[in-house]
Regions:
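Acidic donor-binding/catalytic loop of UDP-sugar-dependent glycosyltransferases
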Residues: 43, 83-97, 169
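A conserved acidic beta->alpha catalytic loop
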Residues: 25, 37-45, 85
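Short aromatic/hydrophobic "clamp" motif used to bind/position activated sugar donors
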Residues: 78
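Short, well-formed alpha-helical segments that are part of the catalytic scaffolds
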Residues: 9-28
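Conserved donor nucleotide-binding strand/loop of the catalytic core
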Residues: 31-34, 45-72
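Acidic helix N-cap motif at the loop->helix transition within catalytic regions
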Residues: 17-21, 42-50
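Hydrophobic helical membrane-anchoring modules
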Residues: 1-2, 169-231
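Conserved donor NDP-sugar-binding/catalytic core segment of glycosyltransferases
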Residues: 89-119
Length: 231
């Protein structure tokens, strides 16, 4: 089995409350960690600089932040991680095994949502089915890909939202998308804030809107709550 170097790219914006916990998981790891700040107004940058390489890219959105991190990455493999998400302990082994597979261009992990609400377990099952049946993981599942393949694909499209969805749909044409048999654990904060089923409904409406050709900027405003009445 080949041994690859891995760069973890974490786009952030006002994540001071959680970024330290996220970065601590890499303290005893040999991976490169790049935090790409989008113009935080809190202590995110100061905290992150103690534990990772930090750059600031304002006004580019998450897609621009991830592309900037990828440009600077020194490793063979890129792994894009949300600021509120933890990887499984053996993620290096899993990433290496998957990208060693013939005709596999990229991968991601299953999803576990931090929270006791039983309905979250249903969401996890639905994510597992969508990811495995349709090879369609989302960004909160820690997408990983070789830097060479990422560059050849043109990186993430400059979209206000759905950049992960668009990217996966595009690279599926170049090879298989594999799902690692272990979950990342992501914060349940968004589900807790709006409620599990309302959050799920909003997510599905965003996808439908994207397929209908509604502009990503309008979809992003809807997702963030701007211009959205209580459902």
């Amino acid at each position: 089995m080949a041994q690859y170097t891995i760069s973890i790219i974490i786009p952030v914006l006002n994540e001071a409350a959680i970024i330290k916990q996220t970065l601590e998981q890499f303290q005893d790891s040999e991976v490169e960690v790049i935090v790409v700040d989008g113009g935080s107004q809190d202590n995110t940058v100061a905290i992150a600089r103690q534990m990772a390489r930090v750059i600031t890219i304002e006004g580019k959105g998450r897609a621009g932040q991830m592309n900037a991190g990828a440009d600077l990455a020194r490793s063979e493999i890129l792994l894009f991680l949300h600021a509120d998400t933890r990887l499984p302990a053996n993620f290096i082994e899993l990433v290496t095994q998957i990208l060693d597979r013939k005709n596999t261009v990229a991968g991601a992990f299953e999803l576990a949502i931090d929270g006791r609400d039983k309905s979250l377990r249903w969401i996890e099952r639905l994510v597992r089915m969508r990811s495995r049946w349709f090879s369609l993981p989302y960004g909160d599942q820690a997408i990983f890909i070789s830097k060479k393949a990422f560059v050849e694909a043109g990186g993430f499209a400059d979209l206000a939202i759905m950049e992960d969805f668009e990217f996966i749909k595009r690279i599926k044409k170049k090879g298989k998308i594999a799902i690692a048999p272990a979950p990342v654990t992501t914060s349940g904060r968004r589900w807790q804030k709006l409620g599990v089923w309302q959050t799920t409904l909003i997510n599905q409406l965003i996808i439908i809107g994207y397929y209908l050709g509604i502009s990503p900027t309008k979809l992003c405003n809807f997702y963030r709550g701007r211009g959205r009445k209580k459902l």
